[in-house]
Amino acid sequence: MSRWLSLLLFAVQAVGGYEAGEELSCKRRHGGIPLPLGVFTVQKEGFPDALPAIRTALSHVHSRSCILQGYRLEMIVKDTHCKTSQGMKALFDLIASRPRPVAILGGQCTEVNEPIAMALKYWQIVQLSYAETHAKFASSDSHELFTTFFRVVPGSRNTNMAKCKFVNHFGWKRVGTVKQNDQPRYALPHEALTTRLEHGFGVKIVHTAGVNWEQIETVGGELDELKERDVRIILVDVDEEMAATVLCAGYHRGMYGDNYVWILPGYHSDKWLNQTHDNCTVEEMREAAKNHFSVEFALTRRDVDTKIVGNTRAGDVWNEITQLDPNNTWRGYLYDGLWTLAIALSHSMGDNAEFSHHKMMEAIDNSSFQGLTGKVKFANNERLGLVDIKQWSDGQYVPFAVYDGADDEFKIIDSTTKGWSPPLDSTITERRREHISSILFLAMSLLALIGIFLALIFLLINFRYRNHRFIKMSSPNLNNIIIAGSICTFASVIMLGLDTRIVSPDVFVWLCYTKTWTLCIGFTLSFGAMFSKTWRVHSIFTNIRMDRKAIKDSKLFIILGILLFIDICVLVTWAFVSPFSYTVTELPHIPEDNIVIIPEVEKCNSSHSGVFQAVLYAVKGVLMILGCFLAWETRHVNVPALNDSKYIGTSVYCCVVMSVLGLSTSVILQERVNEMFSLASFFVIFSTTLTLCLVFVPKVIELARNPVGNEPRAYRRGLMKSVVAKTSQPMSPQPRSDSSGDLIGKAESENKLRRRYLHQKSTQLWDLVEKLRAQGDTRFLQQEWCLSSASPSSQERETSLLLRQPSSSNNREETSLTAAGPNGERSSDWPWVDPDEPSTKL
């Protein structure tokens, strides 16, 4: 009994491992009862030799531990040739042998392991593979199909978890995947990977690209889909040759570099990267593969100084088996696999030394010791081991991170993170609200306020000196309208720059109405008043008739009222039919590396705004065209007091040009808020200020020069010059064949007609003067031009009557146009005191 207790104690010690400096508590004896152990290998070219590592492990089990005291493991090696038939024959040979093997270590090929594992469950014989990584042995029904099958090498469960931890470590939440449909070795673990990413880590699988060799031409299209969906992190589960094809296709689509991360399976080789592809050179392949990651099971543990099972440094054991077979990828798992079986065998021995397969499977599942490939631990027949994550850098793989499945720990190797920074999992969409620059808004608002202040000064002057002769003759009421309209347009500049940084969205909607109405009505008031004044000047100097009536300000206000009525009708209809609403409009995206900026602008939205804007533009356009026409027609008029000289015409031209430019820039630059606001504000402020200055600065100068307004001769001189300039425009050019006599005759005829017209007007003037004198109106008679004048002579009255009667002698109008006295001299009271100083009271 004590013998078996000692054996159990040794087994427990082996399972728990040995600490540094600990010596064996038993004395090993050579020989013992043989325990047959089946070993499946592949002994042919291209496959590594498994026996050196197994023999080393077997030697350490018997010489460096107290387990299996009194027993000796004997290997029964069978070559399966990596063929199903040979493998099954080897299995039957082992089953037929006596005694039967207590367990089987191996094999390496899936096509051999699968039927053997399915058969061994009927004999309850444990099979521990050192090289099987196929995902079918970790599926949901694998425990039922392969009850006694274990593998000491980490499978897809570990590599998938390592990939998930890797993705989660960098905070990537959007990934794309590529799987090889025609290879279950890669397709099955890929499905488990995507499920775990989505449900275990909250990572969105944007798109899974399926590739296979039968439809190899579709690889490019699948990658195009990934690129179109802005996938930056790509997990790939394909074989080596397909991996080269995928990377080559990605290279031609620009899916490489610092903005992309390719996570590939680990093949424990880099030869596939140094081969020339059909569509890529070696240099292109290296460029495409730069900084990609590989995820593969670790060949050995990194902490080489750790004492492992057998009370030996891990580094020493690794060097020992590497010297024996340096090209065997599985040498570490061969070593740990034999130790796993030895420890499980020692634990499965009962008190009566009877072997139990059930206890052995239970012992393997409960194993936990420090091995050459890390901590050896199993869960559901699966090894929970180490997984290396390596990065391709400078033509070689360098360690980047490690995942320990036994302790579920993920660790980045700090020294390898230099020179690389994790990219974003997608292009970041940054919504940037485009607001008018605060400095620009303040500057334009200040200019607008200065303009309003200037307009108020002009309004004060216009009101203060409204009875001044110069101000009174320039229609001060209309000038006040021009000032009111200018104040509205200046105010619209300030309202144009307000946004939701200052006001709420609800107030912004009302602001949409306010600035539209203010600008529209302000333009109509200012331009309409100037248009009315220009029309009156045009009517006076281009429509000289005998029965012409005076055009009073009331008629001009009627014109202005009609224009305002049209605006109000359109604006009110607009407000009811298509009201404004607050909207945020996206502008064209601006890509910047991993960031896409989406500019947004705040707008006053109206479903039918285009229609109403077109109506307003049409009305204003017609008004401006007519204004330009009238300004051109009155270009020769130069009466400062009556039509503000040529300044009104200049203002009309300025308003037209600035309005066209402002409208054009507002439409073209409506997506560039700063440029649009600055130009629109400039045009409004410039044109409005220029109009105010052209209309009122000459008045201010005249007030400074003549505060009393007692120089009527200067006012009358301008009017007479304008009349003469208009009525004495040269006749149309005549052919050079006309004789001098004909030209003189035509000139005399025209002179007679004009002199008759002047005489008639003079007679009418004096008739009115006599009526005023008869009524006792002395204020009018005290005017300077009237004090020294006398009533026209009786001869002149008779002459005037004769001028109204046509001559019948030769059926044509003959007129005696003489204003001379009996002695042939001009009467002193004809029709002005000074013929060179005409009156403005036409």
From Swiss-Prot:
Extracellular-side segments: 18-438, 499-506, 578-610, 669-676
GO cellular component, one term: G protein-coupled receptor heterodimeric complex
Signal peptide limits: 1-17
GO biological process: G protein-coupled receptor signaling pathway; gamma-aminobutyric acid signaling pathway; negative regulation of synaptic transmission, cholinergic; regulation of locomotion; response to xenobiotic stimulus
Tissue distribution: Expressed in cholinergic motor neurons.
Result for mutant: residue 572 to A: No change in protein function
Protein name, per record: Gamma-aminobutyric acid type B receptor subunit 2
Taxonomic path: Eukaryota, Metazoa, Ecdysozoa, Nematoda, Chromadorea
Gene it is expressed from: gbb-2
